[in-house]
Amino acid sequence: MKRFLAAILMLAILFSTQALSEGMTSNAPGEEGMAVASFDQDFLGYIHAQNEKENYVVSPLSFRTALMLAVEGADAATRAQLLGAMGFASEEEMTQWYATVRESVDFFEGWVARQEQIAEEEAQYYPSGEAPEAPAHAFRVLNSVWNNADRFGEFLPDYVRAIAERYGAAADSAAADQITDAVNRWCDEATAGLIPKISDDLSECAAALVNAVYLKSSWVDEFSKNMSGPEDFTDIDGNTTRRDMMKARDRYLYYEDKDTRLVSIPLNGGLSFIAVLGDDANWLSNYAAAEYTDVDLWLPKLDTESAFGSAALKGYLMDRGAVDAFDANAADFSRMADQAWYISDILQKARIKTDEEGLEAAAVTMLVLAEGAALEMEEPQYREFHADRPFRYYIITTSTPTPLVVFAGQEVK
């Protein structure tokens, strides 16, 4: 290939608008979809800027969902700051977003159930009484919270009840010498082995909030293995390597202008794999404008895994105003626990694999909480303002939409 694949997972696995309809609908996102996507675009842009010359895979959905577990236990400024950094104007908007996630999962599971029913009906036509086994499909968004029994603080019953009802989250407790293995085992099972471990040591944490996303789906039209083979791939530095390339000639949703080429490869269960060559700044609007076109498609097989830590994930949130949650003296998670906690670390691991049959991908995001300063015992943090040198002053109105300067002056001697 003579051009670099610009989006090796901004290649995004996109929740297509077909996911909520049995029929073929427009691929154009609605106003609400565009608003939701603005968080994804912003987050992906931040990650891309730090990994511009590396293959990577990341899950905005997993990151956002894990943060929802924190929001449910946060209060006051901590809660408001997290909501804003997550791109939500209100708690209601957050709830609506997660309802859309669940609708996408429910649609996928409905498709799987229909395929299983069809297979059962067709089994009678086979001599063995069993139809050929279909590829396994799964789309899971799972949540869990973990309390270190040997540290101070426990989850409040109201918090445990709320996250169970709203996000299906399971709450568990483990001793300091067991919590690491317990959390890693949960991640391994939730991701079918793609993410076998999220942490090497959680023994010192007070709690962990964990989300896992797992997807395994087949292409609507599978690639022929007979057409696959090695081809040149020119990387971002201009170096050429041989990559195992899948090939197809078919009709796909396709967009092209002088800077960009975009193709949408449909996956079963109401999902699409969007690949972009060139400038991907407007990939979502370009996808909305794509039309069915005959395409000679080459796509390299993927097996990419990534790990992101606090430098990227906590850094992203703090740059967008969510600072109190990470401050031991300011964090307010009083709706979560009976002791003062703060978020000490955020981790995400993700992996994606593709072949001629389909795609398998997983991500785990974990928020690690540590013991903070008790809010009721907190000493005020005074900022010094000593007018002991020349200064200016202004007397303004605060009852008007725009302040009026009634008096102004200075003292210099």
Language-model regions, residue ranges each:
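Sec-dependent signal peptide cleavage junction
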Residues: 15-31
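N-terminal targeting/tethering segments
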Residues: 32-59, 63, 68-77
